[in-house]
């Protein structure tokens, strides 16, 4: 149950952040607009982290698909664990584990929060007229 609660929290955080980006950046796709701002300001490392976490959230919401395949290709470079196609469990015998493709532990939830805060900070610097 704890892992499921963490997954719901992470998905909720990113969903609310996306809604805020859409509203404040005046864009139907807030993440794309934010990614352009990160790229234009040469924040490539943060851009990559945003893309990784955005795809992880999509894999949590939708299961296997493009976002999951993206994560499988990036697996050695991710800040969090994903369940690889040949894996059944993250930790066999862990009764708190739920059937999801991303290991949503404290590290993952805090990573989501850090990415949101860091992206917000860059947006406030690059677009000072926007309140995020």
Identify the meaning behind each predicted range:
Residues 1-2, 27-30, 37, 89, ...:
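Residue-level signal for well-ordered alpha-helical segments
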Residues 1-31:
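Short, contiguous, well-structured surface segments enriched in hydrophobic/aromatic residues
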Residues 22-37, 67-74:
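Short acidic alpha-helical/loop segments enriched in Asp/Glu that coordinate divalent cations
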Residues 38-43:
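Short gly/ser/thr-rich secondary-structure transition/capping motifs
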Residues 1-8, 44-47, 51, 103-106:
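Short, solvent-exposed segments of well-ordered alpha helices
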